[in-house]
């Protein structure tokens, strides 16, 4: 009871001194308020507080409401965001707003110590340093492409894999669901032929230049990785039961992605006789009926979507074609096992991958070059080298060859002079 309570004036003086320091700090950052004027206002408020011995509500109101400034030196909008003093930009975080202000001031504090590069954003400097170190942390889920910047990866997905939604059409799978399935990390190489059947009709066509350019550089990886992973993960009893396991993170499933985007093309674009497009590869129902052959299952998983009814394939044109076998006409399910299917190579000079001895009926056949291969992608690229009207006319440069030997030598030399 005998102790004396501390004077509230000491607390008020300490707080006024703290406010004075913060006000000077605000003036140094923004430059919008005169430091002397604020100091005088605070001193006047301090004298009133000393005389009354009360708290300082007038000081708080002056800082928050009248001046519209905070201790960090930025104005706030009605929803509480920090506002740029040069434009109408607003941000919730101070760091983001400071980076934005550097656009107006031209300040670039983040500089590379190896070259003259400078940036206003720290993340841009981090991406630039990867060009010196060679680090490429961003990888495409659909192929072996790697890059050092996220924006380059997005550009690659749009340009190579056609991941932009088609206007005026409806895909069989929603874009969010498709992305979720494609980005699902799994170690199993599923039997994606079954998923491809449900994605698009058999009459879908693929633009030849994009198709050839997308997959030519990925052929070596497909030959080794797909067969090894299939031999370890695919059960000998048959197909996987989970449909989401059918679309996994491997280079072959970019065909499935392309098929899903082109599944609802208008009918006028589905002209198999056009020389600018490449029809779908052969759709043999026996491929689905032979799941026990693991190596062939891995190769077939990269094929373009086929008919949803494996027992009743549609008839094929009888014209000399680049992507179809001469026996690709209508056939029943039992007869498909005895017919000669068609698979080819990317070029006549490229040998077939080293595979175990297989039944010739499980290999795709090029009737022009008399070659058998078990990879459907190589077959499609190889058949694209044949001319549409003349099978021994180079489809790249237009050179007319005499026979299959002259045709093979022409591609072995690699001299494609435009005529």
Swiss-Prot record:
Residues in cross-link Glycyl lysine isopeptide (Lys-Gly) (interchain with G-Cter in SUMO2): 5, 185
Domain of life: Eukaryota
GO biological process terms, semicolon-separated: negative regulation of transcription by RNA polymerase II; regulation of transcription by RNA polymerase II
A GO term from the CC aspect: nucleus
Mutagenesis or variant effect for residue 98 to V: No effect on protein abundance. No effect on chromatin binding. No effect on localization to the nucleus
Ranges of Low complexity composition bias in the record: 290-311
Tissue expression profile of the protein: Expressed in brain, heart, skeletal muscle, kidney, and liver. Highly expressed in THP-1 and M-07e cell lines, which have characteristics of myeloid and early megakaryocytic cells respectively.
Family: Belongs to the Ikaros C2H2-type zinc-finger protein family.
Protein name: Zinc finger protein Pegasus
């Amino acid at each position: 009871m005998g102790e004396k309570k501390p004077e509230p004036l000491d607390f008020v003086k300490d707080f006024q001194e703290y406010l004075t320091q913060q006000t000077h700090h605000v003036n140094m950052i923004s430059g919008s308020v005169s430091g002397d004027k604020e100091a005088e206002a605070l001193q006047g408020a301090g004298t009133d507080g000393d005389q009354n011995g009360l708290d300082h509500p007038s000081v708080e109101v002056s800082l928050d409401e009248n001046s519209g400034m905070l201790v960090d030196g930025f104005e706030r909008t009605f929803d509480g965001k920090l506002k740029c003093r040069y434009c109408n930009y607003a941000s919730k975080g101070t760091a983001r707003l400071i980076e934005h202000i550097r656009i107006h001031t031209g300040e670039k504090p983040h500089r590379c110590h190896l070259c003259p590069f400078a940036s206003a954003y720290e993340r841009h400097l981090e991406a630039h340093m990867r060009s010196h170190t060679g680090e490429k942390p961003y990888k495409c889920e659909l192929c072996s492409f790697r890059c050092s910047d996220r924006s380059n990866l997005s550009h690659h997905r749009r340009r190579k894999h056609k991941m932009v939604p088609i206007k005026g059409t409806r895909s069989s799978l929603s874009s969010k669901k498709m992305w979720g399935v494609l980005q699902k990390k799994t170690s199993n190489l599923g039997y994606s032929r079954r998923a491809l059947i449900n994605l698009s009709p058999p009459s879908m066509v693929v633009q030849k230049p994009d198709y050839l350019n997308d997959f030519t550089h990925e052929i070596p990886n497909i030959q080794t990785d797909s067969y090894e992973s299939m031999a370890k993960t695919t059960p000998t009893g048959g197909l996987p039961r989970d449909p989401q396991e059918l679309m996994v993170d491997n280079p072959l499933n970019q065909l499935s992605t392309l098929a899903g985007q082109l599944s609802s093309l208008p009918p006028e674009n589905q002209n198999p006789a056009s020389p600018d497009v490449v029809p779908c590869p052969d759709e043999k129902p026996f491929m689905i009926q032979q799941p026990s052959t693991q190596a062939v299952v891995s190769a077939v998983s990269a094929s373009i979507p086929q008919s949803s009814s494996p027992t009743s394939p549609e008839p094929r044109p009888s014209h000399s074609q680049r992507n179809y076998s001469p026996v690709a006409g209508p056939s029943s399910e039992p007869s498909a096992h005895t017919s000669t299917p068609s698979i080819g190579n990317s070029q006549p000079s490229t040998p077939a991958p080293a595979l175990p001895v297989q039944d010739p009926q499980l290999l795709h056949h090029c009737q022009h070059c008399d070659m058998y291969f078990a990879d459907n992608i190589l077959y499609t690229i190889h058949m694209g080298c044949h001319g549409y009207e003349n099978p021994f006319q180079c489809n790249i440069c237009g050179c007319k060859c005499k026979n299959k030997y002259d045709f093979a030598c022409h591609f072995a030399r690699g001299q494609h002079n435009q005529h």
